[in-house]
From Swiss-Prot:
Keyword NADP: no
Species whose genome carries this gene: Haemophilus influenzae (strain PittEE)
Compartment(s) of residence: Cytoplasm
Name used for this protein in its record: Chaperone protein HtpG
SUPFAM superfamilies: ATPase domain of HSP90 chaperone/DNA topoisomerase II/histidine kinase, HSP90 C-terminal domain, Ribosomal protein S5 domain 2-like
Region entry B, spans: 340-555
Record-linked NCBIfam families: PRK05218.1
Principal location class: cytoplasm
CC terms in the record's Gene Ontology section: cytoplasm
Length: 626
């Protein structure tokens, strides 16, 4: 008999997610069983952990398991566990709302592409709500460990706008999830179909999955029923990697991550000695929707002596490897370990160092063995990996080898060139790795600063991600070669520089008074004015000194709301260009000023992508064209 019944409305995000799931995951509908068994496994893990300090929570029943049964006449499937269970408050919190930061942004990001929706929802972790893919009504009966039998809770919903919650009596600890299947989903009311799904997705979770099966006598007559364990229920990571197939590794990854796609690669290692631990690390194929959400925890599952301790233990991986999935099982950490203890712990620091090294080795091997697959990985996670040089000095060179860039060597914008590739193609006498940063690939590719390099056939890396400038402030050299921006006023080409010709000397002398006129006109608005022989098709450019903040870094600071120091540019004019020659011959000071301002504005526009006063620029063009 239920008491204290109330009807409540779903959080708006839940309603939206339910509708998206029902329409987007139809082709993957069997995952409902994987998700519900995974939830049951989590409930068992949480009970084991809490019972370490309070064994009475087992209530005399320490054999944890999940049971799957069906009733063909009633059209129901029941998934039962004897794990931690839930209180009334927890039921409302967990089943009526989605307590995930960034949920609204995630739902907004979903478009009409069903394949994309399916993938994104899988990454989000649909969990309990996947039940509504196959059921038109879901009933949950649950009692939290340690609570009295009359403190159990009944939750019911048809997956629409609301749900009901009431108090009931339940003798056994744990949770029963009863699915009332839709009329066209009766295929799941079949023992062998359910066995197939459990074998596919849940064979290697560390919890026995049992099904109620019929027993037959010697004459083949049905004589009863019994609970039969139908999965291996061993902790896959405890087995020798030689005994685990690729398909088993892939299935375990999907259980662990709730991902639909296979991982790109994985590494399973057992380490003995001063520190004994086992790690199973995976590189996903697709970036999760919340990869750049700083509020969301990203990390490994932590086990101590095969006992689950916590999800998302971020202390074992640097932030730039937050896309890694997997687990670590340590023999050296205490069973009562907490996030606070992990924060300042020598064992944690040593494990983090080892797991970071192992992860980078996985990526190095992938890049070496399958360049195409690595480039697919790079498209998904390259932006995150670029954070590496800014936060991991010890592994900076290793991370640098894994970076990929667009380059003038290739036609397209694909980031496919490594620093090692670049060095192999360097010109004889070239001492630096040259690069340019810009707002976009197109802006970088068409920068006037490239003209001399294109003329000489010197490769330049084209960088257009927002993080690039920040990364390069830490990554200043690679393999003994300096990384040098080609937009700097004091650019040194070393042995590749042209010897100053007699013609250039004559030009410097002939344009001397012109340069002084420009300096006097612009005054403090620029750092200095000078001639340049590094341009071919462009009349003028602006550049910064080595000790000055670059344009892109200034933009980065401004976007982050940080104070930006004033950037004073060097204004460089091309004496070979017909416009510069024309301006140099203008005697009228007003006309001369208009043309100089126009050349400066053009140069600033090419460098910064915008002007402080675009209206004045347009007015000046119209005036000079008229």
């Amino acid at each position: 008999m239920s008491q204290n019944q109330e009807t409540r409305g779903f959080q708006s995000e839940v309603k939206q997610l339910l509708q998206l799931m029902i329409h987007s995951l139809y082709s993957n509908k069997e995952i409902f069983l994987r998700e519900l068994i995974s939830n049951a496994s989590d409930a068992a893990d949480k009970l084991r952990f809490k019972a370490l300090s309070n064994p009475a929570l087992y209530e005399g029943d320490g054999d944890l398991r999940v049971r799957v049964s069906f009733d063909a006449d009633k059209g129901t499937i029941t998934i039962s566990d004897n794990g931690i269970g839930m209180t009334r408050e927890q039921v409302i919190d967990h089943l009526g709302t989605i307590a995930k930061s960034g949920t609204k942004e995630f739902l907004t990001a979903l478009g009409q592409d069903q394949a994309k929706n399916s993938q994104l929802i899988g990454q989000f972790g649909v969990g309990f709500y996947s039940a509504f893919i196959v059921a038109d009504k879901v009933t949950v009966k649950t009692r939290a460990a340690g609570e009295e039998a009359d403190k159990a809770v009944l939750w019911e919903s048809a997956g629409e706008g609301e749900y009901s919650v009431a108090d009931i009596e339940k003798k056994s600890r744990g949770t029963d999830v009863i699915l009332h299947l839709c009329e066209d989903e009766k295929e799941f009311l079949n023992e062998w179909r359910l066995r197939e799904i459990i074998g596919k997705y849940s064979d290697h979770i560390g919890l026995p999955v049992e099904m109620l099966t019929k027993e037959y006598d010697d004459e083949g007559k049905e004589c009863g029923e019994k609970w039969e364990k139908i999965n291996k229920s061993d902790a896959l990571w405890t087995r020798s990697k030689n005994d685990v197939s690729d398909e088993e590794y892939k299935a375990f990854y999907k259980h662990l991550s709730h991902d639909f796609a296979d991982p790109v690669t994985w590494a399973h290692n057992k380490v003995e000695g001063n520190q004994a631990y086992t790690s199973l690390l995976y590189v996903p194929a697709k970036a999760p929707w919340d990869l750049f959400n700083r509020e969301h925890k990203h990390g490994l599952k932590l086990y101590v002596q095969r006992v689950f301790i916590m999800d998302d233990a971020e202390q074992f991986m640097p932030n730039y490897l937050r896309f890694m999935r997997g687990l670590i099982d340590s023999n050296d950490l205490p069973l009562n370990v907490s996030r606070e203890i992990l924060q300042d712990n020598k064992i944690t620091a040593a494990l983090r160092k080892a797991l970071t090294k192992r992860s980078l080795q996985m990526l190095e091997k992938l890049a070496k063995d399958d360049a195409e697959k690595y480039l697919q990985f790079w498209k998904e996670f390259g932006l995150v990996l670029k954070e590496g040089p800014t936060e991991d000095f010890a592994n900076k060179e290793t991370v640098a080898k894994l970076l990929r860039f667009a380059s003038t060597h290739n036609d397209g914008s694909e980031q496919a060139v490594s620093l090692e590739d670049y060095i192999l193609r360097m010109k004889e006498g070239q001492k630096a790795i040259y690069y340019i940063t810009a707002d976009s690939y197109v802006a970088a590719k068409n920068s006037p600063h490239l003209e001399l390099f294109n003329k000489k056939g010197i490769e330049v890396l084209l960088l257009s991600d927002r993080i690039d400038e920040w990364m390069l402030s830490y990554l200043t050299e690679f393999d003994g070669k300096q990384l040098q921006s080609i937009t700097k006023a004091d650019l040194d080409l070393g042995d590749l520089a042209d010897k100053e010709s007699e013609t250039q000397k004559q030009q410097d002398e002939a344009f001397g008074s012109f340069i002084e006129r420009v300096k006097n006109l612009l005054g403090e608005r620029v750092k200095t004015v000078r001639l340049t022989h590094n341009l071919t098709d462009t009349p003028a450019v602006v550049s910064t000194d080595n000790d000055q903040m670059t344009t892109q870094m200034a933009k980065l600071f401004a976007a982050a709301g940080q104070p930006v120091p004033e950037v004073k540019y060097t204004f460089e004019l091309n004496p070979e260009h017909h416009l510069v020659k024309k301006v140099a011959d203008i005697a009228d000071e007003t006309e001369f000023a208009d043309w100089v301002e126009l050349l400066l504005e053009q140069a600033m526009l090419a460098e910064r992508g915008s002007l402080e006063n675009p209206a004045a620029f347009i007015k000046r063009i119209n005036k000079l064209l008229g």
